[in-house]
């Protein structure tokens, strides 16, 4: 009997101890600092432990005012060559998944003549391809051959969710080809009134090689070119420039002969643009008569670092001529550079605002992003009244 009473007493004490520990843990959890959510509205999330990272965000506004966003995945466990499409019917506050598009990668959304298009490559280092949706992204055509959107070209091609431009009666998009260890700039264009799914309607420019001797030998490569329209002149391509070190620059490449040839003068066509060593989007605003972009500019306070991997600051800039750029606002910033990034902003004008989708590395309940590059979120961000007070809201931080 004595042993039974002792066991009973021990069980009661043990239960009381467990209850006390649970209450103590609950109290600690209640007072622990909550994990902050990334800025803006979350479209998609993939914890770092999945080894599936989210990239290549693109954004379009449908004729009825709804927003459509797309993105793809990368990383060791990521599904290959697949784009996910989401839609918002409430101006970006909430998002619903429309589905996945197989055999599509590094793609841009754009609207033309009431239809929604998705244009990129059919796989990483693949062939240019384009699809059309007549129901706002719920379903898509399939690029099976040259008459249905497979824009077959010899070689391997890279790109990103870069702007598709409508200008001079044509649709324009930039790509880069992988040739002899070089990324060569090129432009594809087609007449506005032709079937964009028919490869015969697309003109391809001559491929423009780069030269490692540029920028005193600091030039590495260029990529992710933006097609940009110019008033009273032919379109240009503004490319991201990767360098060994030094100030971040973009390359301004002119189109000639209705998109058949490209020209670039390294002595004058490298442009100082903070953040241009990472992917960016440039668009012209007829109201302000300025070109606008959102980049990962790097503050001076970061010191001497690899600028290409510093993505924790997002800055709004504009230019009257694509050559002289002014920083207006720091839109987002996090003090940590290694595991936080607001990057690959693709955006559209929406009245007095800019709306954007971002590839974001940020904190989550699973321990946060693996690195600033290996992003675990796709988010939506609204920049309100972007044209207002552009002269008085310059960042107080100097930019490299």
Per-segment meaning from a language model:
Residues 2-17:
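Bacterial N-terminal signal peptides that target proteins for export
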Residues 14-27:
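Bacterial N-terminal signal peptides
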Residues 33-56, 60-106, 110-160, 165-224, ...:
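Beta-rich carbohydrate-recognition and catalytic domains
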Residues 278-279:
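Alpha-helical scaffolding within the catalytic cores
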């Amino acid at each position: 009997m004595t042993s039974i009473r002792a066991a009973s007493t021990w069980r009661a004490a043990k239960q009381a101890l467990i209850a006390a520990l649970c209450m103590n843990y609950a109290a600690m959890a209640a007072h622990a600092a909550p994990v902050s959510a990334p800025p803006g509205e979350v479209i998609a999330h993939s914890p770092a432990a999945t080894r599936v990272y989210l990239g290549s965000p693109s954004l379009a506004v449908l004729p009825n005012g709804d927003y459509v966003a797309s993105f793809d995945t990368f990383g060791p466990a990521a599904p290959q060559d697949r784009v996910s499409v989401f839609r918002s019917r409430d101006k970006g506050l909430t998002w619903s998944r429309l589905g996945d598009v197989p055999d599509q990668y590094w793609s841009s959304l754009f609207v033309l003549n009431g239809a929604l298009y998705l244009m990129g490559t059919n796989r990483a280092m693949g062939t240019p391809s384009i699809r059309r949706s007549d129901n706002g992204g719920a379903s898509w055509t399939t690029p099976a051959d040259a008459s249905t959107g497979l824009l077959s070209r010899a070689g391997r091609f890279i790109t990103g969710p870069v702007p598709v431009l409508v200008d001079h009666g044509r649709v324009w998009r930039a790509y880069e080809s992988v040739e002899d260890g070089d990324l060569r700039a090129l432009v594809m264009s087609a007449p506005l009134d032709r079937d964009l799914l028919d490869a015969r309607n697309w003109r391809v420019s001559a491929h423009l090689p780069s030269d490692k001797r540029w920028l005193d030998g600091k030039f590495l490569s260029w990529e992710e070119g933006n097609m940009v329209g110019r008033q009273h002149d032919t379109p240009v391509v503004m490319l991201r420039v990767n360098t060994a070190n030094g100030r971040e620059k973009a390359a301004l490449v002119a189109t000639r002969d209705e998109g058949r040839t490209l020209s670039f003068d390294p002595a004058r066509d490298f442009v100082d643009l903070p953040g241009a060593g990472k992917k960016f989007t440039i668009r012209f605003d007829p109201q302000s008569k300025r070109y606008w972009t959102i980049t990962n500019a790097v503050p001076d306070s970061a010191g001497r670092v690899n600028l290409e991997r510093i993505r924790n600051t997002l800055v709004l800039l504009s230019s009257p001529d694509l050559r002289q750029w002014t920083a207006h606002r720091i839109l987002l910033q996090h003090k940590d550079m290694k595991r936080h990034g607001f990057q690959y902003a693709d955006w559209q004008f929406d009245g007095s605002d800019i709306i954007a989708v971002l590839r974001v590395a940020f904190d989550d309940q699973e321990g946060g992003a693996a690195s600033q590059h290996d992003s675990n979120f796709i988010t939506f961000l609204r920049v309100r009244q972007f044209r207002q007070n552009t002269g008085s809201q310059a960042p107080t931080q100097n930019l490299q």
